[in-house]
Structure formats: structure tokens, C-alpha cells
Amino acid sequence: MTTTAYDTHFMASDIAFTVNRTEVTLNIPFRKVKRLGDIVFGMAGCLFCMRDFSEALIDFILQNKTQFELPRSILEKTNSDFIALIYLSGSCLKVSKMVNDTEFTIENITNVPTVIGSGSFHTQHIIHDCPNAIAVVLEAIKYDQYTAGEVKYCS
């Protein structure tokens, strides 16, 4: 992972990821990665959507709500996808709202092998050998350590 900038307590990064379990491939880079205590989450989507998602997640955590509601700005967005990965207590969840969908989905991708790198969509032959590299990177961010050789870069 390469950290490229800091702005308003976000860490901008160039993470992209590929999942090869049900042929779900997402080759869009994270635009923002944020740490909130033991929770780390990365997002890709419009800037305002990422801001709204961050605020909704913080409200959900701080107020101990039982149900998470995706912000209206994301649900009503029709010209771009929104994806967030949330890492907490060793689990990696993917929240996504794609352009043509009317609902958002939450998936547990902790056990899905993943590869990180700008060229990850070219690496189908080695994905089965990789651990969940997303979780590795998010765990590293949680402790302010960046990869330490654990992530297989494929670009």
C-alpha cells in the first residue's frame, strides 16, 4: 500500500482489489482510508458519498445503533458505484451500492482470497495462493505499519 496524502484525518491511498470467489472483480482504487480506533475502513466513490458514509458509520458506532443505514446521498446516486470495506476484530466486510442497484449489500469477505495492487485484475492465476490481502493492509493501517512485506503486490 502506498500512502499518498493526508487531508482532514483521511489517508488517501491507491489500494485496488480483486476477489475471485463468485467472479466478483472490483478494480477501482480506494480513494479514502480512515482509522477510527480499532476500526479501519476504506472507500471508493464520490467525495460527498465518502464523507456521508464516514459520518453515518461514526454515528452508528458512537450511538450503539442496532441497524446501519446507508446515507441517502449514496442510495440516490445514479452515476457512480460506492464501495466501502470495513475491518473490525479480524473481520472484513464489504458494503456496496452499485449504479444500477436500488439497495446496498453487505458481505463478509474475510475468507475470500484477495490480491492488492493496481494491476491485480491481471493476476487470476495467483489469487488462490493469496490470503485476504485487504485484511492484512487494514490491520497494518490499524497499527500504523504499512505492509511489512505481508501483502503480495501484483502490479
Segments (PLM) and residue ranges:
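Short polybasic amphipathic segments
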Residues: 82-85, 95, 151
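C-terminal binding/interaction regions
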Residues: 136-155
